[in-house]
């Protein structure tokens, strides 16, 4: 339910800037959000609406990160915008290591090799396998949503080798 609430907040921020947005959930939410279907997501995207996926996959044992990557792969997304409680990917946990360095860009191979736990392993592997870059940015700053949607760089981009 928390992802649905967060998704509705993101939708509100986008709509305040004039960007149409639609929340699609893995389970019925009445008038609040529409149940996910690939066809509906693709139709919204074709009309220029930002689609926000919420509620995971609707199946146990799958994280919301894995759900985001799965949905992105299903619709052929160019990039995943992943708002987190951290502002990007670091060489170590910045809360524990004051020398941790934030990456502007990092490869999936390095994330996996160094066990950088920015997304869970299945999500990272699925994004890598489907060649989908992921922009990880801080949800704490509401302006970040507008920044990333308008193409401004913030956070870290996780991608394949260049």
Protein language model features and the residues they cover:
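C-terminal catalytic "cap/lid" subdomain
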Residues: 1-162
């Amino acid at each position: 339910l928390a992802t649905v609430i967060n998704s509705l907040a993101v939708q509100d921020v986008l709509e305040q800037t004039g960007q149409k947005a639609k929340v699609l959930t893995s389970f019925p939410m009445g008038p609040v959000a529409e149940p996910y279907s690939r066809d509906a997501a693709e139709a919204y995207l074709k009309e220029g609406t930002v689609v926000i996926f919420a509620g995971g996959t609707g199946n146990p044992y799958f994280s919301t990160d894995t759900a985001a990557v799965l949905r992105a792969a299903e619709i052929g997304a160019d990039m995943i915008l992943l708002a987190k409680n951290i502002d990007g990917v670091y060489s170590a946990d910045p809360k524990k290591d004051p020398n941790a360095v934030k990456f502007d860009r990092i490869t999936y191979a390095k994330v996996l090799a160094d066990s950088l736990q920015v997304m869970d392993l299945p999500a990272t592997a699925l994004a890598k396998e489907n060649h989908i870059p992921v922009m990880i940015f801080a949800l704490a700053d509401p302006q970040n949503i507008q920044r990333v949607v308008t193409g401004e760089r913030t956070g870290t981009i996780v991608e394949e080798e260049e």
